[in-house]
């Protein structure tokens, strides 16, 4: 290793280089590119200097379109400008990319390349986004791994300045952007020597200046437009040599050889793969292995994709090549081939001795590519007629594009590399601990290190698998670990759900966090699990990290215990030295959370090493027989064939045929109910003797895992053991039971916290103690549907309505889901939902687990997601589409009244026409009308037509859901337009005051003083008052609510909003894990109450109907604040951490925040006529 070595991921490497060359960064958060901008923002806040002696000026915009516009403007003003983006965000920049390229401006777009949303959304890596901008005129430079991101990102900036062409500098999303590697860092002093100062001076002089003004962006006619476009050709013709020159200089600095196209392999290769991105490292491993066995193969790795230089291409490709396979990580439906393949075929167009060239697609949406997949490509090239247009790594049994597996398993050498896998659960700290571990190994030892983290889409409580490799040589294996030396599991429930030991080498080590004794292990471990441990001579250890963490006061955060145990077992470095390093990491990671938290975690490190228990594996485990398979319960095909394999982490094995009939992205509702994840450590247990039957616990439950049930006498007598009940208050004919699903509960504890009963009618107990209650839950859900004996617009009555949102993947204690669940209880059987991309779309529709469900009649919310930026328009379009069909129905029904129909049908049609826009009673009217049409339609075309459209008889309740990032920022223009349209749509904004889905970035909803990403020193601008802006139209129903503060007001506002025959907007305060509640998310509802009592959040409603009635339309539902505003702020880490680091600044900003809140409250009082 020469030079300074540091452990970092691809995003950090790109940020490090770009910071040096950047004066202005205009950004907008989007996964997986956001950490690049976050790094830049953090360094700028710390005063870090770029090459020009200044901190970077970073500006978060309202959208990627806005970011691209700001990039364009800053470049025209003469500042070196950069942005960071991916996927749909990059596509929003396309119009400005054309402009920036056409105006020869040296901007750089760093892209962590990601899949595009087509029939579904996918946040993982491929090249669909970058291939969609190859026509813009921007140069395109690709990197294969983290080290190349460090080295070649500099080339993008340097060549942009010298060549006057903007660059798209890209690398694979997640696989490179989030992979942690130990790499050599280029120092700014080195980069400064490469900068072409005269070219930079020329750029500055060419900027827009009033001292020597010019005009740019003229409107041109056909006479000159074409010629001026062609005049720019010479810049593109010169660019490849400029890039090659800078690559030569970088190579001289680093000792790593770079060219526009890098060839590696046999000098006389006959078969060559051409590719770009992280797959090249996998291909390289295969090439080395095959050549060592005497074959003649090679790899041509593409770096400069645009402009595509034929001279440099042929200079690198061996003359001996006879067959070429081109790998594209994108899909262009209808094209003859994918882009890189077309370029390669075109390169040989005039060559009489051209090799045979085939192309294939691989790794769309982050699919893993293994060495055996690449071996299959080389096998394909050996065939007399190689398959063209193939797919890699899947089984296509529909259109038969997939390559068959390699003829024999390829044994790629990983000698000297130790591979470790860590199974964890989102929010249990496993990923964070492993990031600390890999940095300790990388930065504190001579070893090379690599880490990659795979996740599912659940917000927390989902599965995570950390893949760590370390060894005495560079590690370039960009795929998941399938042969491990060490495996750890932090969740004991996983032993029954996943094949944890798959790939663990003979003699390897397995560490399990569990509370089981050795005797209990015999009972709980599956037979196949025990057999593998015994037959493969596995070293098996357990650690009761849960109980130790609880005793230490760490709750469910036992990550440090497990990490310390890993260091002791792995023996990579001296355990005591490792413990010291871990303790230092704790101080750095948890410094903002106070001395007590630091001390608890440091003590956990000590106990993690001291409390390990080695299990003596009984000899008889090796000869255990698999028990007879039990007959599975009847289940839908989708559950058996798709959901269950995916939930076992076997989705990669599903063939294309599994999705025939789902090609448009349609998934069935209600699939989350089949998961039964059992992720809670503790779950609530009903104590009927103290229960007041208020149903508040069900009202606020984020996962709909608590539900009141009414049993008639027969059902009560037939109830299973364990079903407790008491006489129902207000419904004497029934027994009341509070059903709790232990396997669907996330264990947040909000139900216990808000229970008003003296002594609490709910108590938390361990999940294991309540598993036997699952049949009781099933029985309660299967009870006969009953008419609600209470008004459903009351807190108590609403909870006797079936929730049509259940068991989502939202965080424990989520502040968003209770609102959505409540709305489904009120209107769910006739709802259409347009959902903006964000947290609510991820917990709302992460395949295959869909929490939106149906009632006993099969009715429920129909849900769809378009994009982040267009959700309001999308929802309006839904409403207009349904409205158009219903207008046709109304016309046909009016005509049908002239037909000789029965009085019953005539009356049903008249009633429908008179009340078609009324929600109350719409289902009953629709049912009656459908019934009469079915009886009389035969032989009457008009009635037949009406009956065919019967699904539209029910008045639909159109809802538009989204977070504050959508409503306040990227989607605000569309939201404003929809509100101004006057159309009858209902909008619900989950206001978490940050971009929750991308990790807590600042939005225009973020108040002054809050620390958020892109507001590292506290936000300085006032929170936008979205409600007041909407209210200015006069005909929009607007409400601000906080369920935890006033459940009745929340319910009233939602009911009024839906009933208002025009646009309505409900802004709902939602506590979020990003707020860092010191009381924990078990108090998220209480936090909303504190926010209102302190005057931080205000409750109000604006009803246009009241003005028509001569009343004040604005109703202030909040009382005068009585609690301490400052104490409320200090109860959340997002505010308290600023006070810890810079108390004087925090005090000043806290005062501003409180003044803003008081000013808003005073204004609300005036509007309500209280002053």
Swiss-Prot record:
Its EC number is 1.2.7.-. It catalyses: oxidized [flavodoxin] + pyruvate + CoA + 2 H(+) = reduced [flavodoxin] + acetyl-CoA + CO2. The keyword Iron-sulfur applies. InterPro entries: 4Fe4S_Fe-S-bd, 4Fe4S_Fe_S_CS, PFOR_II, Pyruvate:ferred/Flavod_OxRd, Pyrv-flavodox_OxR_EKR_sf, Pyrv-flavodox_OxRtase_EKR, Pyrv/ketoisovalerate_OxRed_cat, Pyrv_Fd/Flavodoxin_OxRdtase_N. [4Fe-4S] cluster 1 binds at residues 691, 694, 697, 755. Transmembrane segments: none annotated. The keyword Metal-binding applies. It is an enzyme of class 1 (oxidoreductase). [4Fe-4S] cluster 3 binds at residues 811, 814, 839, 1072. Pfam families: EKR, Fer4_7, PFOR_II, POR, POR_N, TPP_enzyme_C. SMART domains: EKR (SM00890). One of its GO terms (molecular function) is thiamine pyrophosphate binding. GO terms for biological process: electron transport chain; nitrogen fixation; response to oxidative stress; small molecule metabolic process. CDD domains: TPP_PFOR_PNO, TPP_PYR_PFOR_IOR-alpha_like. Residues 682-711, 736-767 form the 4Fe-4S ferredoxin-type domain. Binds 3 [4Fe-4S] clusters per subunit. Its cofactor is [4Fe-4S] cluster. It comes from the Bacteria. Keywords: 4Fe-4S, Electron transport, Iron, Iron-sulfur, Metal-binding, Nitrogen fixation, Oxidoreductase, Repeat, Transport. [4Fe-4S] cluster 2 binds at residues 701, 745, 748, 751. Oxidoreductase required for the transfer of electrons from pyruvate to flavodoxin, which reduces nitrogenase. Belongs to the pyruvate:ferredoxin/flavodoxin oxidoreductase family. This is Pyruvate-flavodoxin oxidoreductase. The gene is nifJ.
């Amino acid at each position: 290793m020469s030079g300074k070595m540091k452990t970092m991921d691809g995003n950090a490497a790109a940020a490090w280089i770009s910071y040096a060359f950047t004066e202005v960064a205009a950004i907008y958060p989007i996964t997986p590119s956001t950490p690049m901008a976050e790094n830049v923002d953090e360094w700028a806040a710390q005063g870090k200097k770029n090459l020009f002696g200044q901190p970077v000026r970073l500006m978060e915009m309202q959208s990627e379109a806005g970011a691209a516009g700001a990039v364009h403007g800053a470049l025209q003003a003469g500042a070196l400008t950069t942005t960071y983006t991916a996927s749909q965000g990059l596509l929003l920049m396309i119009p400005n990319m054309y402009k920036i390229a056409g105006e020869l401006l040296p901007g750089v777009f760093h892209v962590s390349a990601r899949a595009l949303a087509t029939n579904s959304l996918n946040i993982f890596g491929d090249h669909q986004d970058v291939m969609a901008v190859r026509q813009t005129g921007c140069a395109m430079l690709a990197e294969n791994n983290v080290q190349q991101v460090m080295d070649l990102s500099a080339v993008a900036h340097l060549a942009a300045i010298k060549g006057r062409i903007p660059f798209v500098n890209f690398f694979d999303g997640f696989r490179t952007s989030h992979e942690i590697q130990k790499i050599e860092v280029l120092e700014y002093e080195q980069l400064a020597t490469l900068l072409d100062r005269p070219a930079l001076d020329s750029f500055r002089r060419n900027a827009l200046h009033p001292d020597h003004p010019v005009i740019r962006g003229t409107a041109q006619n056909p006479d000159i437009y074409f010629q001026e476009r062609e005049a720019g050709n010479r810049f593109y013709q010169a660019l490849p040599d400029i890039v090659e020159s800078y690559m030569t200089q970088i190579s001289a600095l680093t000792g790593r050889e770079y060219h526009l196209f890098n060839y590696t392999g046999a000098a006389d290769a006959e078969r060559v793969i051409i590719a770009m991105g992280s797959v090249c490292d996998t291909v390289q491993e295969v090439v080395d292995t095959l050549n060592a066995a005497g074959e003649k193969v090679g790899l041509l790795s593409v770096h400069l994709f645009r402009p595509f230089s034929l001279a440099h291409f042929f200079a690198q490709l061996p003359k001996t090549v006879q067959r070429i396979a081109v790998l594209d990580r994108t899909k262009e439906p209808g094209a003859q081939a994918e882009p890189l393949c077309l370029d390669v075929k075109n390169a040989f167009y005039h060559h009489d001795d051209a090799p045979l060239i085939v192309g294939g697609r691989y790794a769309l949406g982050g699919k893993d590519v293994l060495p055996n997949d690449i071996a299959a490509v080389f096998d394909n090239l050996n065939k007399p007629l190689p398959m063209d247009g193939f797919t890699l790594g899947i089984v296509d049994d529909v259109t038969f594009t997939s390559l068959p597996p390699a003829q024999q398993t390829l044994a790629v050498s990983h000698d000297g590399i130790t591979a470790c896998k860590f199974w964890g659960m989102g929010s249990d700290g496993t990923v964070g601990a492993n990031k600390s571990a890999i940095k300790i190994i990388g930065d504190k030892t001579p070893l090379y290190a690599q880490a990659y983290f795979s996740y599912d889409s659940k917000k927390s409580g989902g599965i995570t698998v950390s893949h760590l490799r370390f060894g005495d040589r560079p590690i370039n294996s960009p795929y998941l670990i399938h042969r491990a030396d060490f495996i750890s599991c932090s969740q004991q429930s996983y032993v029954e759900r996943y094949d944890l030991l798959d790939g663990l080498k003979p003699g390897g080590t397995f560490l399990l966090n569990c509370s089981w004794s050795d005797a209990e292990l015999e009972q709980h471990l599956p037979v196949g699990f025990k057999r593998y441990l015994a037959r493969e001579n596995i070293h098996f250890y357990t650690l009761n990290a849960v109980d130790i963490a609880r005793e230490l006061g760490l709750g469910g955060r036992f990550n440090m215990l497990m990490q310390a145990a890993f260091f002791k077992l792995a023996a990579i470095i001296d355990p005591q030295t490792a413990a010291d390093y871990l303790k230092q990491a704790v101080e750095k990671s948890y410094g903002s959370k106070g001395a007590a938290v630091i001390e608890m975690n440091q003590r956990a490190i000590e106990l993690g090493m001291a409390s390990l228990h080695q299990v003596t594996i009984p000899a008889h485990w090796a000869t255990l027989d698999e028990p007879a398979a039990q007959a599975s319960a009847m289940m839908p095909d989708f559950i058996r064939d798709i959901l269950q394999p995916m939930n076992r982490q076997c989705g990669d094995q599903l063939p294309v045929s599994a999705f025939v009939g789902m090609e448009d992205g349609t998934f069935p509702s209600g699939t989350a109910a089949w998961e039964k994840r059992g992720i809670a450590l503790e779950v609530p247990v009903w104590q009927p003797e103290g229960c007041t039957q208020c149903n508040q616990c069900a009202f606020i439950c984020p996962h709909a895992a608590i539900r009141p049930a009414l049993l008639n006498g027969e059902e009560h007598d037939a109830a299973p053991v364990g079903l407790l009940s008491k006489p129902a208050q207000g419904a004497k004919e029934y027994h009341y039971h509070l059903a709790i699903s232990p396997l669907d509960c996330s264990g947040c504890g909000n139900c216990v916290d808000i229970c008003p009963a003296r002594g609490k009618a709910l108590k938390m107990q361990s999940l294991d103690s309540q598993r036997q209650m699952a049949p009781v839950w099933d029985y309660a859900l299967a009870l006969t549907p009953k008419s609600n004996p209470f008004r459903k617009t009351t807190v108590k009555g609403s909870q006797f309505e079936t929730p049509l949102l259940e068991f989502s993947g939202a965080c424990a204690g989520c502040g968003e889901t209770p609102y959505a669940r409540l709305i489904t209880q009120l209107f769910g059987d006739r709802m259409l939902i347009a959902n903006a991309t964000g947290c609510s779309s991820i917990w709302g529709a992460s395949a295959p687990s869909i929490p939106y469900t149906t009632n006993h009649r099969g009715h429920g919310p129909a849900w769809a997601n378009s994009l982040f930026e267009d959700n309001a328009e999308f929802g309006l379009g839904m409403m207009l589409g349904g409205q158009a069909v219903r207008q046709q129905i109304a016309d046909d029904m009016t005509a049908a009244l002239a037909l000789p129909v029965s009085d019953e049908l005539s009356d049903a049609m008249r009633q429908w026409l008179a009340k078609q826009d009324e929600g109350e009673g719409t289902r009953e009217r629709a049912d009656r009308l459908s019934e009469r049409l079915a009886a009389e339609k035969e032989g009457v075309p008009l009635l037949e037509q009406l009956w065919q459209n019967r699904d539209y008889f029910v008045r639909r309740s159109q809802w538009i859901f989204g977070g504050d990032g959508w409503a306040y920022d990227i989607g605000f223009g569309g939201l404003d337009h929809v509100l101004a349209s006057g159309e009858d749509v209902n909008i619900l904004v989950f206001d978490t005051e940050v971009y929750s889905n991308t990790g807590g970035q600042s939005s225009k909803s973020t108040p002054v003083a809050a620390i958020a990403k892109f507001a590292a020193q506290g936000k300085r601008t006032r929170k936008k008052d979205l409600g007041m802006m909407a209210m200015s139209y006069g005909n929009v129903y607007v409400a601000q609510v906080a369920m935890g503060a006033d459940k009745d007001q929340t319910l009233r506002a939602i009911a009024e909003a839906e009933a208002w025959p025009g646009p309505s907007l409900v802004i709902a305060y939602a506590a979020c894990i990003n707020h860092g509640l010191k009381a924990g998310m078990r108090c998220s509802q209480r936090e909303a109450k504190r926010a209102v009592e302190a005057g931080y959040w205000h409750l109000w409603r604006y009803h246009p109907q009241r003005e028509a009635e001569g009343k004040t339309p604005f109703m202030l539902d909040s009382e005068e604040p009585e609690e301490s505003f400052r104490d409320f702020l200090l109860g959340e880490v997002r505010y308290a951490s600023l006070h810890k680091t810079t108390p004087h600044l925090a005090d000043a900003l806290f005062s501003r925040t409180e003044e803003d809140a008081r000013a808003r409250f005073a204004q609300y009082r005036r509007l309500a006529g209280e002053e």
